[in-house]
Amino acid sequence: MTTILAIAVFGAVGCVARYLLAGGVYALAGRAFPWGTLAVNVIGAFLIGLIMEAALRTTLMSQELRLGLTIGFLGGFTTFSTFSYETFKLLEDGEFFSASLNVLASVALCLVGTWAGIMAARQL
């Protein structure tokens, strides 16, 4: 039961964090390109690499905390569904370059983010 509670609490925090961060990015950069979604997904990719690698290398992180952070917080913070919707809308609006850029940038930057998180955890 503590694992489910950890996932729920961390998930709620992740959702609010995504709302605030993405909203802030959109306020600065506008909505012509899905910068807010890209930002939260890249940050989330970095954090999953950091957390999972750190969890593999130490016994200091309990299973409840690891699952709360990864499934809960990062599950609420990152958003593949919004990425998909925003990319579809770009395609529907004839913004083929922006849609392609969003797909390529999301995949490439998220992979680099995950790698950077893993490398950072290995330095701890």
Swiss-Prot record:
Binding site for Na(+): G75, T78
Annotated S-S bridges: none
GO terms under cellular component: plasma membrane
Domain of life: Bacteria
Bilayer-spanning residue ranges: 4-24, 32-52, 68-88, 101-121
Membrane topology of this protein: Multi-pass membrane protein
Protein location: Cell inner membrane
Catalytically driven reaction(s): fluoride(in) = fluoride(out)
InterPro entries membership: FluC
Family membership noted in the UniProt record: Belongs to the fluoride channel Fluc/FEX (TC 1.A.43) family.
PANTHER family in alphabetical order: FLUORIDE EXPORT PROTEIN 1-RELATED
Function: Fluoride-specific ion channel. Important for reducing fluoride concentration in the cell, thus reducing its toxicity.
Protein's UniProt name: Fluoride-specific ion channel FluC
Species per Swiss-Prot/TrEMBL record: Geobacter sulfurreducens (strain ATCC 51573 / DSM 12127 / PCA)
Upper classification of the organism: Bacteria, Pseudomonadati, Thermodesulfobacteriota, Desulfuromonadia, Geobacterales
